[in-house]
């Protein structure tokens, strides 16, 4: 049976780029763990801002963080007070000078990570999983996605046995490297256990300029 490779990892260097961009000789593992720590901290702290993606760049003892969020106003705060406090906390956490750049996600309805988190939140609020999936699918297509597939896996509806249910509309080519596929994953922590939500959104093909 064919297994599903990670859609973004599969397209790295073709139509996708890395989310951490830096070079290290001896302290590679140390910096990698620092990256993971930073991502986890930012995801937790800025959860209500709807963080879609975090990109990290490093040069010498400086770190530049690009945060893509659906609600950037929450991160920035009044007159930039929140972002300044965040900058200080991150500098304390890493012992490095940190620069933060906040970017707005214009269409959160077709951002796979935000769609996955939205479905997971609905499942935690005990919304029927089929309704949550169908609503997100119709919204994504309405906002210009060419195809979307949502998979929910776990004890759906509190069933005794865990199972996987998926819903797809439009085209979602898994093997076409030039296909711009966005991938998102989230977990819904329900009283019955964890339900995993995977979202694949096809936004069209990236054609080379030559």
From Swiss-Prot:
The keyword Ribosomal protein applies. One of its GO terms (cellular component) is cytosolic small ribosomal subunit. Pfam families: KH_2 (PF07650), Ribosomal_S3_C (PF00189). SUPFAM superfamilies: Prokaryotic type KH domain (KH-domain type II), Ribosomal protein S3 C-terminal domain. It comes from the Bacteria. Keywords: Ribonucleoprotein, Ribosomal protein, RNA-binding, rRNA-binding. The keyword Iron-sulfur does not apply. GO terms for molecular function: mRNA binding; rRNA binding; structural constituent of ribosome. Residues 38-106 form the KH type-2 domain. One of its GO terms (biological process) is translation. Binds the lower part of the 30S subunit head. Binds mRNA in the 70S ribosome, positioning it for translation. Belongs to the universal ribosomal protein uS3 family. Part of the 30S ribosomal subunit. Forms a tight complex with proteins S10 and S14. This is Small ribosomal subunit protein uS3. It comes from Syntrophotalea carbinolica (strain DSM 2380 / NBRC 103641 / GraBd1) (Pelobacter carbinolicus). The lineage of its organism: Bacteria, Pseudomonadati, Thermodesulfobacteriota, Desulfuromonadia, Desulfuromonadales. The gene is rpsC.
